[in-house]
């Protein structure tokens, strides 16, 4: 099974507001960069989308080390998701899980691979995490410009 390192990040201008996600995928000495964004979103949604998009970009099952600076993603995937699934994607107090459709998509994407999750401190000089952050900001930029243009009208 191929081994892939993935570094993800999300960014948002306002929360909610225009947002973007970025991911760096590395297999040996081959590197792929991805980014995207949405006009009206949250930072947490962008963090989730970065991980989902990166895992879905892998064409075959892989051994994956996925690095994120999001405690929300780390806690959700390692602590909370088991209870949510058991409760039909409801929280302990029977409310629908926030961003439930994205958590379900991440769960499905993860199930195709053998993923080990790693938390990295954001904005601490980790080169791949910094690059994922740059890609997230790049993914957000077109939506940020449109948001500013709408504000001037």
Swiss-Prot record:
Binds 1 Mg(2+) ion per subunit. May bind a second metal ion at a regulatory site, or after substrate binding. Residues 1-141 form the RNase H type-1 domain. Mg(2+) 1 binds at residues 9, 47, 69. It catalyses: Endonucleolytic cleavage to 5'-phosphomonoester. Its main location: cytoplasm. This is Ribonuclease H. The lineage of its organism: Bacteria, Pseudomonadati, Pseudomonadota, Alphaproteobacteria, Hyphomicrobiales. Mg(2+) 2 binds at residues 9, 133. Its cofactor is Mg(2+). Keywords: Cytoplasm, Endonuclease, Hydrolase, Magnesium, Metal-binding, Nuclease. Its EC number is 3.1.26.4. Belongs to the RNase H family. HAMAP family: RNase_H. One of its GO terms (biological process) is DNA replication, removal of RNA primer. InterPro entries: RNase_H (IPR050092), RNaseH-like_sf (IPR012337), RNaseH_domain (IPR002156), RNaseH_sf (IPR036397), RNaseHI (IPR022892). It comes from Sinorhizobium medicae (strain WSM419) (Ensifer medicae). It is found in: Cytoplasm. One of its GO terms (cellular component) is cytoplasm. CDD domains: RNase_HI_prokaryote_like (cd09278).
